[in-house]
UniProtKB/Swiss-Prot annotation:
GO MF annotations in UniProt: ATP binding; hydrolase activity
Post-translational modification: Oxidation of Met-45 to form methionine sulfoxide promotes actin filament depolymerization. Methionine sulfoxide is produced stereospecifically, but it is not known whether the (S)-S-oxide or the (R)-S-oxide is produced.
Residue list for modification Methionine sulfoxide: 45, 48
Compartment(s) where it occurs, according to its Swiss-Prot or TrEMBL record: Cytoplasm, Cytoskeleton
Entry protein name: Actin, muscle-type A2
Keywords recorded for this protein, A-Z: Acetylation, ATP-binding, Cytoplasm, Cytoskeleton, Hydrolase, Nucleotide-binding, Oxidation
Propeptide intervals in chain numbering: 1-2
Catalytic activity: ATP + H2O = ADP + phosphate + H(+)
Predominant cellular place of this UniProt entry's protein: cytoplasm
EC assignment: 3.6.4.-
N-acetylaspartate PTM positions: 3
Extra remark: There are at least 5 different actin genes in this organism.
GO cellular component, one term: cytoplasm
């Protein structure tokens, strides 16, 4: 393991889940929620060795007694102390590696504040003493994972959605659009519309239950109005869900009303365009000669694109917006939940990429600002 490209680590820090593993693998070894939980109550059992904070799955399993916080909001790290805990947990508990022995590839959302990636760089080199690191744009990695160099990626996770047009491997920064509407907003919206049915979900722990309902039962309707009529006329769309305490709740039109907000953000009281229009607007900001290629290579990525029916609906909506002669193809790879990580794994194991790493030495000479020069 003396070679420099010895086992790079790939860490995709999402707003909702952290995906981590080794470059060259075909799937992340560790996938856990990006959550730090702190006890809500005073410990009374002396000698139990209670911790002052829990990370990831352990925080999730003890959520009843904890206040859960997500250190990444809308793709931007807002709480660095908690973020450090998550990285520490990733390296030492999940992957069981010493970060000072491996180059580390991190990911971030496009159009993030510059200070965000500088601070990431600083923590990697100064706190974890890693030998080399790199920060890659999430959507670009998703395109790599789909085996393309040209296309437009709609990457929608828990905290942020964005559309990134890429031509021959270059992201076109002027045409990147960002939409602060993603999985977490849909979870909150589902909490709200379930309240209308008389079910009350309020705490941070209950929000996780609603997220599970959303992931298991929601889908995107091809025709929203018609689906609403079907739901009103019969009970064919109703599904039941058993809560952890054994009580069973029934959900009907909420199943498709919740993800409909992706196409109609006005449901959430937002004035922005839906994801279909965002993709279209992003394509229209590109050079007229490459639009055809983008329409034909529209790649979905991220957990919020996992709803059944979303690809067909995108096809229908974008076809309605685009010129009638254009061929539109929506690519929704089955592994799209992890495609950012998979792309990172591919990138970090390319021989041509090895000269791209920012080394500890370069960092010591130039400081955190080096990240803007070396990473796209």
């Amino acid at each position: 393991m003396c070679d420099d490209d010895a086992g790079a680590l790939v860490v995709d820090n999402g707003s909702g889940m952290c995906k981590a593993g080794f470059a060259g693998d075909d799937a992340p070894r560790a996938v856990f929620p990006s959550i730090v939980g702190r006890p809500r109550h005073q410990g009374v059992m002396v000698g139990m060795g209670q911790k002052d904070s829990y990370v990831g799955d352990e925080a999730q399993s003890k959520r009843g007694i904890l206040t859960l916080k997500y250190p990444i909001e809308h793709g931007i790290i807002t709480n660095w102390d908690d973020m450090e805990k998550i990285w520490h947990h990733t390296f030492y508990n999940e992957l069981r590696v010493a970060p000072e022995e491996h180059p580390i590839l991190l990911t971030e959302a496009p159009l993030n504040p510059k200070a965000n990636r500088e601070k990431m760089t600083q923590i990697m080199f100064e706190t974890f003493n890693c030998p080399a690191m790199y920060v890659a744009i999430q959507a670009v990695l998703s395109l790599y994972a789909s085996g393309r160099t040209t296309g437009i990626v709609l990457d929608s996770g828990d905290g942020v959605s964005h559309t990134v047009p890429i031509y021959e491997g270059y992201a076109l920064p002027h045409a990147i659009l960002r939409l602060d509407l993603a999985g977490r907003d849909l979870t909150d919206y589902l909490m709200k519309i379930l309240t209308e049915r008389g079910y009350s979900f309020t705490t941070t722990a209950e929000r996780e239950i609603v997220r599970d309902i959303k992931e298991k039962l929601c889908y995107v309707a091809l025709d929203f109005e018609q689906e609403m009529q079907t739901a009103a006329a019969s009970t064919s769309l109703e599904k039941s869900y058993e809560l952890p305490d054994g009580q069973v709740i029934t959900i009907g039109n909420e199943r498709f009303r919740c993800p409909e907000a992706l196409f109609q953000p006005s449901f959430l009281g937002m004035e922005s365009c839906g994801i279909h229009e965002t993709v279209y607007n992003s394509i229209m900001k590109c050079d007229v000669d490459i639009r055809k290629d983008l329409y034909a290579n529209t790649v979905l990525s991220g957990g919020t694109t996992m709803y059944p029916g979303i690809a067909d609906r995108m096809q229908k909506e974008i076809t309605a917006l685009a010129p009638s002669t254009i061929k539109i193809k929506i690519i929704a790879p089955p592994e799209r939940k992890y495609s950012v990580w998979i792309g990172g794994s591919i990138l970090a194991s390319l021989s041509t990429f090895q000269q791209m790493w920012i080394s500890k030495q370069e960092y010591d000479e130039s400081g955190p600002g080096i990240v803007h020069r070396k990473c796209f």
